[in-house]
Amino acid sequence: KGVPLFYLPIMYYPLQEDDRATGFLMPGFGSSTYRGRSLSNAFFWAISRSQDLTLMHDYFSVAGQGLGAEYRYILGPGSQGNLRTYFLNQPAVSYPGVSTTTAAKALSSTSKRSFQINGNISQSIGSAVRIRGRADFFSDVTVQQTFQTNILQATQRSRRVAGNATARVAGFNTSTTVDWAETYFGDTQSTVNGARPRISLRSGEKPIPGLPLYVSLFSEYASVLRQGLSKNYDADGIPEVKKISHSTSRFHINPTLRIPFTKWQFMTLNSSVSWHGTYWTKSFDYESKEQIESGVDRRYFEFYSRFTGPVFSKVWDTPNSSYAERFKHVIEPSVSFQRTTAIDNFDEILKIDGIDSITGGRTRISYGVTNRFLARRRVQGDAREVLSIAMLQNYYTDAQATQYDRRFSTSFNGTAPAKLTPVSLIVRGSPTDQVNATLRTEYDTRYGAFRTISADGTVSLGERFRTTGGWSQRRFVEGLSGFNNRSSLTHFINSATTFKILDNRVGGVYNFNYDVQRRRFLQQRILAYYNAQCCGITVEYQSFNFMGLSQYSTFRNAILVDRRFNISFTMAGLGTFSNFFGIFGGAGQQ
């Protein structure tokens, strides 16, 4: 009857007709230059209609064995969660041509066990309380780098665990957060940031009776931590960890008075005055560069005004256009002024997060203009923004403040203090639902050069075809510290394309990441599948360049490129799965 047929020596097949039937899933077979041959199996347990559990096992002929589990549940709107755990046992392996560095020997020749935990939870308790939790934790960064299929996961430098509870009490929004995050710089240095706990109380704006004024309040208690960790290996490959730690308790209160002015349609003015009071139980001795037990406090006022307008607009009809019957161009200039009173003890404050890095005795003037182009489509009949162009620059009376301006991506790159920030340009275009693109760049007006440029976009043709692309470049600027070292420049291109034809019976994926600066592919991946009425097959091939991880890992061996091949079969009513390292483009999802 024209139904394709294939044979396997052994096949297990649950006969239940329920789409969520309990049973074994189809295994995945693979081969890797680094991991050896692999076999991945999974058992799916449909506990109930609202929860399930998947147990997984991976066998690698060279890299050992792994066990994993994924639990998912949905109790109702706003109450759901998932948790994934994985344990990997790697035997002692000495790869040919391993680097002679002591650290590389220790990483490549000794057996080790590692684990990872990933999860999200969101739970509502009544109508006023919500609990959230998130975990993205791994015990060994080198496992992430060498096992993960997704390059974003392989180059992930941070691991984090966080929990948060919010509630509304007597008109106030309360939040309690406990978080811990570690960011790696290579596999021998890292920085830890955390709060245990961070408790905040916030009131919404309330009008003052009889006056056009609004008042709000924010207060916070936080026990914050920042650690610098470095690991050095001795002659026997045994690591020695050095720790530099800063921690303190902090009390912060911030009342705000806002004065709006919205009587003119073509121009709006919002002004506010805030008082900030902060106390730290510990401080920083600038001469000895050490944390001391003496407390320190800080008090300052902040005055802020933002003008938007005058807004100019022009509308014109296009009766002969097949795209839109009418266009509108809106020009929206804006300027804001912010004055922060003097902070005389800035050098005595421990710099742990953003609140601690505020500089005083300065004025910031921010100015920019936004152009918006809107079109009334003939088909949909509604107006959509097809193009927007936004430019922004800040001026500070204190040049030091530009080094802490989080509105600009290049502020924390070791550039010399300057009163003018670069000009930020963001262009977004979306002429249809199927096409969109974004361009971002920062231009240094002092040196007449672009610091960074990035662009990304998407083109799709319904469910049949979709492609995304991205480009980013960190450019060389002669004389500008942080951008005048050619070895630290970056230039990347990435793309991902998927297609589905014949009612999704045939499809495929191709994606790549290319390092233009060093003229090499970081990774290339090809996936193809065929689904018939009764069965199907999925094949995947990936070439992953370990040399692209040179800025993160000291692990070096003769395997410069890991070539990975995976294959899996499907049958009607019997699903397949992706292991924890993302074969077939997933991340533990079946």
Where do the model's predicted regions map?
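Outer-membrane beta-barrel proteins and related beta-barrel translocases across Gram-negative bacteria
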Residues: 1-590
